């Protein structure tokens, strides 16, 4: 066979293979259409079946691939329904990690806000982290001087829980240097306090729209909880303070429905001090554990009924939970009066468990470092010192800060009780470290029916940043 004949033969074989390959593709397409395109019961690809129930809607996405059914259950909350939140707090044995945002570590190279006062609140379908920004980013020149609490640049924003407070996912909520937020089952309500110290104003937003205001009544830094407010059967409650941080101030409970204030009452606590309350629903009432920045190292307790009647006193436990504080052995508890050294404090929390109490506190007695949570037997009703459980969340070699409470609603958790949860702020930068800025990240823990080992979920950012070296 001469060279020309070889070329013709190879070309003919190649052409034949190409034609055969094309025919195979055509046959494959025809078979696919015939198999997947048949009528009758098998023609349900990508159909959605919706079955309605009394309280919620369960959506079943049914996709059939060659006679194999894949069913995905998607929970859906009817947004026309208020959350109940009259259930009791679940009895828990420990607290497991729910989320950690690592905002400062990520912010060394990412577009993350400079923040303080982060807190968590939940709707029937999600939990969100709220935070007060400083109108600046980490590792940027505008972060200089952000140790200041109140400025016209501070805003309340939020992200899905676990996300760092970044510019790409954050949602604006209110102009604020003090704030609270909660969901009634229909929409989010946020309260942002802003303005000059002597004439501050709290703007109530409902569903993202301003609906009401509270003006400063004492002319001395109107402020609110820095943690979740509480909604029960459509009505939402929060606590505000106006007056000195180191002397007698004035305290009020507010009640709103769909973002409009429908009631308020003054709280009388002569010789005591209430601010930055951490509140949660329990057995149809609002229970708050607050900060006494004037007279004691035990925490004020405020229990609010739906009609705005209240009971006020102090956490009975014979262990102090504010910072700074004295030795546990030297502390005498009281259910009615402030006890301990008369110094400033830090925002904290507690949960009632029957007559017991879970109480969070820094490990250090003198500074905002470390964090632990203790269960004190009969500590809600008696001056007991008996610790039945203790769990370390941040070790004493690392900074902590504010802490506060929230609950997982039954609509979200699927339980028949409210899951107690808390968050711990971990402050970095000024005044304790050599930076030009102050910011924080947070760890969030939720109650479980198991004991959880001690560990340190600390912030972990390596400081200083580049901006601090200029």
Swiss-Prot record:
TM region(s), chain numbering: 15-35
Region of interest: Hypervariable stalk region: 32-86
Alphabetical list of InterPro entries matching this protein: Glyco_hydro_34 (IPR001860), Sialidase_sf (IPR036278)
A cellular-component GO term for this protein: host cell plasma membrane
Keywords: Calcium, Disulfide bond, Glycoprotein, Glycosidase, Host cell membrane, Host membrane, Hydrolase, Membrane, Metal-binding, Signal-anchor, Transmembrane, Transmembrane helix, Virion
Reaction it catalyzes: Hydrolysis of alpha-(2->3)-, alpha-(2->6)-, alpha-(2->8)- glycosidic linkages of terminal sialic acid residues in oligosaccharides, glycoproteins, glycolipids, colominic acid and synthetic substrates
Domain of life assignment: Viruses
Modes of activity regulation: Inhibited by the neuraminidase inhibitors zanamivir (Relenza) and oseltamivir (Tamiflu). These drugs interfere with the release of progeny virus from infected cells and are effective against all influenza strains. Resistance to neuraminidase inhibitors is quite rare.
Main location: virion
Assembly and interaction partners: Homotetramer.
Protein name as catalogued: Neuraminidase
Organism: Influenza A virus (strain A/Equine/Jillin/1/1989 H3N8)
Origin organism lineage: Viruses, Riboviria, Orthornavirae, Negarnaviricota, Polyploviricotina
Gene: NA
């Amino acid at each position: 066979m001469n060279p020309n004949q070889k070329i013709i033969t190879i070309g003919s074989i190649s052409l034949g293979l190409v034609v055969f390959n094309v025919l195979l593709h055509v046959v494959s397409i025809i078979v696919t259409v015939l198999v997947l395109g048949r009528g009758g019961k098998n023609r349900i690809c990508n159909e959605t079946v919706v079955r309605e129930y009394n309280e919620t809607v369960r959506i079943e996405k049914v996709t059939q691939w060659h006679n194999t059914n894949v069913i995905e259950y998607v929970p859906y909350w009817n947004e026309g329904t208020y959350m109940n939140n009259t259930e009791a707090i679940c009895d828990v044995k420990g607290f497991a990690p729910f989320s950690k945002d690592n905002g400062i570590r990520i912010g060394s190279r990412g577009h993350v806000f400079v923040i303080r006062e982060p807190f968590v609140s939940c709707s029937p379908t999600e939990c969100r982290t709220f935070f007060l920004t400083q109108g600046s980013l980490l590792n940027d020149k505008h972060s200089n001087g952000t140790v200041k609490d109140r400025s016209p640049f501070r805003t309340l924003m939020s992200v899905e829980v676990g996300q760092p407070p970044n510019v790409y996912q954050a949602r604006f909520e209110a102009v604020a240097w003090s704030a609270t937020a909660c969901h009634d089952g229909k929409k989010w309500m946020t309260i942002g306090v802003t303005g000059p110290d002597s004439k501050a104003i709290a703007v109530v937003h409902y569903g993202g729209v301003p609906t009401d205001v509270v003006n400063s009544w004492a002319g001395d830094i109107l402020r609110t909880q820095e943690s979740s407010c509480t909604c029960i059967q459509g009505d939402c409650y929060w606590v505000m303070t106006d007056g000195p941080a180191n002397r007698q101030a004035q305290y009020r409970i507010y009640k709103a429905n769909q973002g409009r204030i429908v009631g308020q009452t003054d709280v009388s606590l002569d010789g005591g001090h209430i601010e930055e309350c951490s509140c949660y629903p329990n057995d149809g009432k609002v229970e708050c554990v607050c900060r006494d920045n004037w007279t004691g190292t035990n925490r004020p307790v405020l229990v609010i009924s739906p009609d705005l009647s209240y009971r006020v006193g102090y956490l009975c436990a014979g262990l102090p939970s504010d910072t700074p504080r004295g030795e546990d052995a030297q502390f005498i508890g009281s259910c009615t009066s402030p006890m301990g050294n008369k110094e400033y404090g830090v925002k904290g929390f507690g949960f009632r468990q029957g007559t017991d109490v879970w109480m969070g506190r820094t490990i250090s007695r003198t500074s905002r470092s470390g964090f632990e949570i203790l269960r004190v037997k009969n500590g809600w009703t008696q001056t007991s010192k008996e610790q039945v459980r203790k769990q370390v969340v941040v070790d004493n070699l690392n900074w902590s800060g504010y802490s506060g409470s929230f609950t997982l609603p039954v609509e979200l958790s699927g339980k028949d009780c409210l899951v107690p949860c808390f968050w711990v702020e971990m402050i970095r930068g000024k005044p304790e470290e050599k930076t030009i800025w102050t910011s924080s990240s947070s760890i969030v823990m939720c109650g479980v029916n198991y004991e959880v080992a001690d560990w340190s979920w600390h912030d972990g950012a390596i400081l200083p940043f580049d901006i601090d070296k200029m």
